[in-house]
Amino acid sequence: MSNAPLANQSLQDFVARHQRLFVLTGAGCSTNSGIPDYRDSHGNWKRTQPVNFQAFMSEEHTRRRYWARSLIGWRRFGQARPNDAHHALARLEANGRCGMLLTQNVDRLHQSAGHRQVIDLHGRLDLVRCMGCGAKTPRSEFQDTLGRANAEWLALDASDAPDGDADLEHADFSSFKVPACEACGGILKPDVVFFGENVPRDVVATAQDHLSQADAMLIVGSSLMVYSGFRFVQAAAQRQIPIAAVNLGRTRADDLLTLKVEERCEAALAFLL
């Protein structure tokens, strides 16, 4: 840690002072891995809001649109690799300073970097779940199933959007075929928490339990505009433990922070490598 840039000395000191950090990460942690984020530096949406849970479950055309875009977007998302921010946080854990990492991301890049204690708050995009029988299938296998059913779509390309989505604009999705669950015929959905869907209670309870044992909180790459993540910062503030954030631009918790570093995640955390 002694070779860190002078500008990040305050963050180094914060990490050095605490033994049981609870780390909360967001989309900004993965942008350098080629995965776009949702919001700009002011916390506003860069694109239209992501698909809504109720619409996905009730509207066939919404499911067609989602899976058509995902068929294109998964090709690059599934190849994403951890960047220096992920590796730095894994090193923090290896050094015994991180009690738990709670990520709002669904890309599993923390695990790929070797981080062991990780809670996927919003689920994981590498699995597909049947909403009927609960059966789970690897997303890579479902990609093959989608491709076989929609071979004519495989030649399409589009710019990447967050979380394995692709900006397929002005496409006619009416011909896109969405396979049903082979076991029960149920609706297949990525094993992630959509907007309008609740985070499972046991996941929240487990995260809160780990937070109760922490002596400080470190936020990395999140504007905290979504309440599912922000509530943990509120809980930390209520416990009166120090809270530091690394994020470009404003966060919903700016008035609760002990320290804020407005720098790219991988640069701010470089002293951990």
From Swiss-Prot:
It comes from the Bacteria. Gene3D superfamilies: SIR2/SIRT2 'Small Domain, TPP-binding domain. GO terms for cellular component: cytoplasm. Binds 1 zinc ion per subunit. It catalyses: N(6)-acetyl-L-lysyl-[protein] + NAD(+) + H2O = 2''-O-acetyl-ADP-D-ribose + nicotinamide + L-lysyl-[protein]. Zn(2+) binds at C130, C133, C181, C184. Its main location: cytoplasm. GO terms for molecular function: histone deacetylase activity, NAD-dependent; NAD+ binding; zinc ion binding. It is found in: Cytoplasm. Keywords: Cytoplasm, Metal-binding, NAD, Transferase, Zinc. Its cofactor is Zn(2+). NAD(+) binds at residues 26-46, 104-107, 221-223, 247-249, 265. The active site is at H122 (proton acceptor). Its EC number is 2.3.1.286. Residues 1-273 form the Deacetylase sirtuin-type domain. Belongs to the sirtuin family. Class II subfamily. NCBIfam families: PRK05333.1 (NF003738). NAD-dependent protein deacetylase which modulates the activities of several enzymes which are inactive in their acetylated form. This is NAD-dependent protein deacetylase 2. It comes from Bradyrhizobium diazoefficiens (strain JCM 10833 / BCRC 13528 / IAM 13628 / NBRC 14792 / USDA 110). The lineage of its organism: Bacteria, Pseudomonadati, Pseudomonadota, Alphaproteobacteria, Hyphomicrobiales.
